[in-house]
Design a protein with these regions (language model features):
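Subtilisin-like serine protease catalytic core
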Residues: 1-22, 35-40, 47-53, 72-79, ...
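Catalytic-core environment of secreted peptidases
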Residues: 66, 109-178
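Extracellular low-complexity, Gly/Ser/Thr-rich intrinsically disordered linkers
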Residues: 1, 28-39, 44, 150-153, ...
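Secreted peptidase-domain scaffold signal
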Residues: 69, 75, 85, 201, ...
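Active-site glycine-centered loops adjacent to acidic/histidine catalytic or metal-binding residues
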Residues: 61, 85, 173
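Catalytic-core regions built around general acid/base machinery
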Residues: 57-77
Length: 285
């Protein structure tokens, strides 16, 4: 059923012969926005290799998160969830364009079928980015995931699951992990709209919710270059059982040097305090 079984999927550029698309990478977000989508799952690579650094494709995807349709006068924020790539376990093996700043980049963890859910997959691409920034953003199960299987052409998954008519198989890869996070984004968007009179959370808020609720997988203290900020845990992101305060773009800065000071009261000094600050950054040069 997936993480968000009631969500509406909107396939875009399926079977496109040109890569990147003839209309540029932003064709993805433009078509998705036209279909009413809040974001996209991007379980693919641009084909520009690993340790690509920050170049044109990374810059374009940073722009897409800030504004998914360059051709309209108003900015239309758009969530991009990427798979980290399957070039691990070496350092700085994120596949392009996953060294962009604004997308949510997903590492793969082991599924219960394959071992401990708190182990990172050996194949999962690692950070850091070439310029030293942290990557990936977060992790999700991506190993031995029950998924639909191609019924023609080369198979990319393991042996079919018995009793499924050769239509389902156990598949592994960060391409399996990223949809878990995309499903969490859908759940968090629906939850946020319910609490905020239908308002859609910004891409930065959604990333903040995911990061704040993530749990350490035990490979090293988070954040780290294997799992980012940890394994996604949606109930924790929703703040179940703890006091929470959220601020989503309530103050807009208009000039360099502007500041905002926020005072937070701590009701129980014996309990941990976790603060997450995320912003959708301007694209680099």
């Amino acid at each position: 059923l997936g993480v968000a079984p009631s969500a509406t999927l909107y396939p875009i550029v399926s079977g496109c012969s040109a890569w990147p698309p003839a209309g540029g990478w932003q064709l993805h977000s433009k078509l998705a926005i036209a279909g009413g989508a809040v974001g996209m799952n991007a379980s693919w690579t641009s084909g520009e290799g690993t340790a690509h650094g920050y170049q044109a494709s990374e810059r374009t995807h940073d722009l897409m998160v800030r504004d998914g349709d360059f051709d309209t006068p108003a900015a239309e924020p758009f969530v991009v969830v990427f798979s980290a790539g399957n070039s691990g376990p070496g350092a700085s093996t994120l596949t392009a364009p996953k060294e962009a700043k604004n997308p949510i980049v997903t590492a793969s963890g082991v599924n219960f079928r394959a071992g401990s859910i708190d182990n990172i997959s050996g194949f999962s691409s690692r950070g850091p980015a070439v310029d030293g920034r942290l990557g990936p953003t977060i992790a999700a199960p991506g190993e031995s995931i029950a998924s639909t299987k191609r019924i023609a052409g080369a198979a990319s998954c393991a042996t079919s699951i018995a009793g499924t008519g050769n239509r389902y198989a156990l598949c592994s890869g960060t391409s399996m992990a990223a949809p878990h996070v995309s499903g969490a984004v859908v759940q968090l968007t629906d939850w946020w709209r319910t609490l905020n009179a239908g308002a859609t959370p910004s891409p930065a808020m959604l990333k903040a919710l995911l990061v704040n609720g993530a749990v350490d997988m035990g490979t090293a203290d988070i954040p780290n270059a294997n799992e980012g900020w940890g394994r996604v845990l949606t109930p924790s992101s929703m703040g179940e059982g703890v006091l929470r305060e959220y601020r989503d773009q309530s103050t807009v800065f208009n000039a360099t040097g502007e500041q905002q000071e926020i005072t937070v009261g701590i009701p129980d000094p014996l309990q941990p305090l976790k603060i997450t600050l995320v912003w959708t950054d301007a694209a680099g040069a």
